[in-house]
């Protein structure tokens, strides 16, 4: 019998304070890029009791009302009453916006700087990952954790569980045998709620309306453990309970800790920032390799120097599951995919207001127009070059 082990990943709802910040930052980006597709945006947000701060470096031929964007985002998330400690109508909005440094701009603008191609917006390393554990080629723990938090938000917004409030988290522990998910060992859900609901009702209703509708029944058994609001009470939450910052949930945003992370966040950054665009491309490359049947698991690393178009390194790790040598996989990646920043932006069509939906419930393993990197359109070409 092979090895049995547990692996855990977490997700958070859009009402978690760090996700409120991410949602605001990406709402600002979408508003700007919808008017100026070549805008340069690095928008950071901080939210706390009754206040939202936005700051950063923005260069754009656009006119936007930052306080209106902030308030509308907070309203859509669901902070609509002052008794939550954070209310879209009454919160203060403070802004401090500068222009992008000209020293950075000359390395990114095509035709400027030491190199004439559009270079990377910064140095850095980015990872992409895919595996065959789920239909969307994502790790099972983070996939199910996202499904739970999305369901938490849905049953709150549609009134099925009208005692829920926007802040919430999930955590899923999956038991693996021989590297494959076999069952769910533990589910943790913490959801902010109104003060008048009893603990027993909250626990029973969350199991019935959140967990059971989205987790496959064959993965649950009598030994599965459920921890629902395990402190017993979660009335104070959101920005009133914790200060929220853009970029504080980078593992939730990606692969739940399965697969490595280069450290750069995504939200509030226009696609000239390779932290975002190259991470999306890394996911696209890894997913197409797995979809092609070359490997069951794949991790891709790409790294850049600021102002330089060609990546300084490209690495493909098939994690012991490959049907071809990794050196051949790297060669195929370089032949099939153009990993220069401008080429990535053009290939994935990233100069569009598509970023708002990415800000909560994961940037990967999703469907729809906001997630072009999830396409497997190059799988057949990769399979052909691999000769399998």
From Swiss-Prot:
Pathway: Amino-acid biosynthesis; S-adenosyl-L-methionine biosynthesis; S-adenosyl-L-methionine from L-methionine: step 1/1. Residues 100-110 are annotated as: Flexible loop. L-methionine binds at residues 57, 100, 242, 273. GO terms for molecular function: ATP binding; magnesium ion binding; methionine adenosyltransferase activity. This is S-adenosylmethionine synthase. Its main location: cytoplasm. Its cofactor is Mg(2+); K(+). ATP binds at residues 16, 167-169, 233-234, 242, 248-249, 269. Its EC number is 2.5.1.6. It comes from Desulfosudis oleivorans (strain DSM 6200 / JCM 39069 / Hxd3) (Desulfococcus oleovorans). It is found in: Cytoplasm. GO terms for cellular component: cytoplasm. Mg(2+) binds at residue 18.
């Amino acid at each position: 019998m092979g090895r049995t082990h547990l692996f855990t990943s977490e997700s958070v709802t859009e009402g978690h304070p760090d996700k409120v910040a991410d949602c605001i930052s990406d709402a600002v980006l979408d508003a700007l890029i919808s008017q100026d597709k070549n805008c340069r945006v690095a928008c950071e947000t901080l939210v706390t009791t009754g206040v939202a701060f936005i700051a950063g470096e923005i260069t754009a031929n656009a006119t936007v009302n930052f306080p209106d964007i902030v308030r509308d985002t907070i309203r859509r998330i669901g902070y609509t009453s002052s008794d939550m400690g954070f209310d879209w109508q009454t919160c203060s909005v403070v802004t401090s916006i500068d222009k992008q440094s000209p020293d950075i701009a000359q390395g990114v603008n095509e035709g400027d700087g030491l190199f004439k191609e559009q270079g990377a917006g910064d140095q850095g390393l980015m990872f992409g990952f895919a595996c065959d554990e789920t239909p969307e080629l994502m790790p099972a723990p983070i996939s199910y954790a996202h499904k739970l938090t999305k369901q938490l938000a849905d049953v709150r917004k549609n009134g099925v569980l009208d005692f829920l409030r926007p802040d919430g988290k999930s955590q899923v522990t999956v038991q693996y045998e021989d590297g494959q998910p076999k069952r769910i060992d533990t589910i943790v859900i913490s959801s902010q709620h109104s003060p008048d609901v009893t603990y027993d009702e909250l626990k029973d209703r969350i199991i019935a309306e959140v967990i059971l509708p989205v987790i496959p029944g064959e993965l649950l058994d009598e030994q599965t453990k459920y921890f629902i609001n395990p402190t017993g009470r979660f009335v104070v939450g959101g920005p009133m309970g914790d200060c929220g910052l853009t970029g504080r949930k980078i593992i939730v945003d990606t692969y739940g800790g399965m697969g490595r992370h280069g450290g750069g966040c995504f939200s509030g950054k226009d696609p000239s920032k390779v932290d975002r665009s190259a991470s999306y491309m890394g996911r696209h490359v890894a997913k197409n390799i797995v979809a092609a049947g070359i490997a069951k698991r794949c991790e891709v690393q790409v790294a850049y120097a600021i102002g330089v178009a060609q990546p300084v390194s490209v690495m493909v790790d098939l994690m012991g599951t490959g049907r071809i040598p990794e050196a051949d996989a790297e060669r195929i990646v370089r032949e099939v995919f153009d990993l220069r920043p401008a080429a990535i932006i053009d290939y994935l069509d990233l100069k569009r207001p598509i970023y708002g939906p990415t800000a909560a419930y994961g940037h990967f393993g999703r469907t729809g127009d906001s997630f072009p990197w999830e396409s497997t359109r190059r799988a057949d070409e990769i399979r052909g070059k691999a000769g399998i």
